[in-house]
């Protein structure tokens, strides 16, 4: 049998090879292999061989990080060597404004800018309108009838919240943020003893196992399918282990990346409140126009597949140390972005 080229992925050549094999078989003497019936059978056999060969070739390619093409596979291979691809980055800007409290009754002693949306881009920017948010409440005192919010950092994107309840009876439980476009630098995680409790503990992100013990309130991130992220908590050795029925709150910002770079004019869209005698009041008047300190910049797309394939092995080889020129070439971009 002349069928020796197992790497052949050309449909026509596969069909031709099958035809030659059958012609040399004495059981098929005097058959017309160009006839419609046999030709159709050969087409099916060649197509099946082609698909099988293609799948085998792709499976072999996707096993190695330098030849893989699907993002999920590249990310998975990078995860095996401890590399977390850079997420999408939200464009950041700074704004300032003040509130004239002379006509506000009852008179506040402090005013709080609530977390969530704070401003929108004024007009259309590149045929788009952008929302800018903050991750945490900001409280300022009222002095001489004014409350000044100066040089507040705002981030393009919507503030979203995902809640999870930890179950000790489910060893395979996963905490996956359902939205794409998450900026991993703009994530706040807090854990309550249960859903009814108001007492919460803030957890911080950790990228390594150094200086971590069983009581460290830390979490880890890894990218999973469809550019989403999974939150991983400690196991009682490297980081604090969650207790049954712990209620997890994850606040995060999803952004449009580089599309929002360059916005310099903003309109207030936030929520201002103050508390007097245990009652909360909303501030709707006396709010000045927003002044821009720094135009929005720093927005970036999620790390590309080619970049992951380039930097993941090099980050692993450097082992978080900077000794050689290649180490510096690898670590500096990772720290900057």
Where in the sequence are the language-model features?
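Signature of Asx- and small-polar-rich beta-strand/turn repeats characteristic
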Residues: 1-337
